């Protein structure tokens, strides 16, 4: 199977149909493709591949002027480039293979470490992975070649670090094999897209080709990224021959294109597609030594000391609550800010922003998050970002009050949730109410974005509470509280009023 000519990428076409596209189709027919039809972490990996091909085909763009002029010539340039490098995109065969290192051999004659290709799908219940989307356990699954291609690419971008098998790469031990030559499990670091469960963000265009163009980063911007020395070349052009291939390893780890499509794991697929040889590959520095262009860097003060951190995804906090950080243009804040592609946007027009992440706890994959938001141009300036942050803060303060109100209600009905042995139940009751609140608040997100664009003054919390967003937050909290706290009996009603006073302390009449 060749990724340039065989269909393997699930996409949504403009006619509404979902069909697989070839890598060449992505560029030549990209104006007919509305969007990708994949999971969040797969989207991130695929977009990185598309951007890598586009940059390599253009050998740039060097600056903003080149970026503005390159869209028209991108389809032909990418088509010619993929024809030239087509042999590097073979999934199987005796020659060069896509994202598979050469001359990889098992550490011992009968190596039973990690043979199943199901290890490539982090959503399956295999090894240490929890079941996210899978209902059938066990190894030995068979995957069609088109799915294997996507799994391989995504695994190289997101594989969590930890214990891993070992192998010989051109007769040399794979990185992390500390017991060499004794065959024992090795160690690996996170692949470059995973550290900190970072949120990735990409501005979205009218079609897939426009999205690719919108996310191209100029060479003069690339070299400002920590840990990046140059635009570089894709890893398939300079595939390291062994762990000692310093020149090609430097390209893979310290250049923009080398990192976009990584080889974080040393992999060799069996010809039948059921098994693989898997070991640690190339170690990629992460923040603060290196930064991904799609990540957001924020300033956070801990113990009185401000420092810069990668903005992380959370299963308890939807991405829309971080939009004020995600939309800061990096050009305006040294080392901090949102994705570099924001600098390509017209500051006078609204835009769509896709945000997503694979969330992990150390080596354990937990789940994915994603969201698509229609963002007003006002969010690209500090005044709009601050106003949005104030609106989110109002909601977060209300959510915290809701949790305390639920606890007070239960205390008044004789259910003391502040006892140490009741902690888990208290958290469950509070989180259930908070989940309902945040779900309703997110449905009304356009009201918050409208407040960002509004000329109405919102100088303080009282003004925010009188706004359309403030009324929505109030109503969402009231409904969530009523659902969580029954108020039918006399005692329940008294407890309900006591809790309501916690939720809305300044309300003249808590019973309304």
Predicted regions, residues:
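Flanking scaffold residues of small Cys/His-coordinated metal-binding clusters
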Residues: 136-139
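Short, non-ligating residues that shape and space the ligands of small metal-coordination modules
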Residues: 150-154
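Extended alpha-helical scaffolding segments
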Residues: 1-127, 159-160, 164-165, 170-512
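Short Cys/His-rich metal-coordination motifs, predominantly Zn2+-binding knuckles/fingers
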Residues: 144-147
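Beta-strand elements of modular eukaryotic interaction domains
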Residues: 132-134
């Amino acid at each position: 199977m060749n990724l340039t000519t065989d269909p393997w990428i699930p996409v949504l076409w403009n006619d509404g149909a979902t069909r697989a596209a070839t890598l060449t189709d992505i560029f030549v027919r990209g104006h007919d493709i509305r969007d990708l039809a994949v999971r969040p972490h797969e989207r991130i990996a695929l977009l990185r591949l598309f951007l890598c091909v586009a940059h390599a085909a253009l050998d740039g763009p060097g600056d903003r002027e080149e970026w503005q002029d390159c869209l028209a010539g991108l389809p032909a340039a990418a088509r010619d480039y993929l024809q030239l490098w087509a042999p590097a995109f073979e999934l199987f065969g005796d020659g060069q293979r896509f994202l598979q290192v050469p001359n990889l051999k098992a550490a011992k004659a009968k190596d039973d470490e990690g043979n199943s290709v199901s290890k490539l799908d982090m959503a399956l219940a295999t090894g240490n992975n929890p079941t996210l989307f899978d209902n059938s356990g066990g190894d030995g699954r068979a995957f069609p070649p088109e799915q294997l291609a996507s799994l391989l690419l995504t695994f190289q971008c997101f594989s969590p670090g930890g214990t891993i098998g070992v192998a010989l790469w051109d007769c040399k031990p794979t990185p992390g094999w500390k017991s060499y030559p004794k065959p024992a499990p090795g160690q690996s670091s996170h692949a470059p897209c995973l550290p900190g469960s970072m949120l990735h963000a990409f501005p979205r265009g009218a079609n897939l080709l426009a999205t690719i163009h919108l996310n191209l980063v100029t060479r003069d911007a690339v070299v400002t990224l920590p840990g990046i020395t140059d635009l570089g070349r894709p890893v398939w052009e300079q595939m390291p021959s062994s762990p000692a291939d310093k020149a090609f390893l430097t390209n893979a780890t310290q250049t923009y294109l080398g990192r976009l499509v990584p080889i974080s794991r040393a992999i060799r697929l069996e010809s039948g597609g059921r098994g693989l040889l898997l070991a640690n590959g190339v170690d990629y520095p992460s923040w603060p030594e290196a930064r991904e262009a799609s990540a957001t860097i924020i300033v956070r003060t801990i113990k009185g000391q401000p420092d810069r951190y990668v903005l992380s995804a959370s299963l308890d906090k939807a991405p829309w609550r971080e939009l004020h950080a995600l939309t800061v243009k990096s050009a305006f804040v040294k080392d901090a800010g949102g994705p570099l592609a924001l600098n390509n946007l017209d500051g006078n027009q609204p835009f769509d922003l896709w945000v997503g992440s694979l969330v992990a706890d150390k080596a354990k994959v937990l789940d994915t998050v994603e969201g698509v938001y229609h963002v007003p141009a006002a969010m690209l300036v500090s005044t709009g970002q601050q106003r949005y942050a104030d609106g989110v803060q109002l909601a977060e303060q209300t959510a915290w009050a809701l949790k305390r109100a639920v606890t007070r209600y239960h205390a008044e009905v004789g259910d003391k949730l502040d006892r140490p042995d009741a902690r888990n139940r208290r958290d469950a009751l509070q989180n259930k109410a908070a989940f309902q609140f945040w779900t309703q608040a997110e449905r009304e997100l356009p009201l918050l974005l409208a407040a960002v664009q509004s000329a109405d003054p919102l100088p303080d919390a009282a003004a925010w509470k009188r706004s359309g967003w403030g009324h929505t937050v109030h109503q969402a909290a009231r409904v969530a509280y009523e659902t969580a706290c029954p108020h039918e009996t006399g005692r329940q009603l008294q407890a309900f009023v006591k809790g309501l006073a916690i939720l809305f302390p300044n309300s003249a009449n808590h019973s309304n």
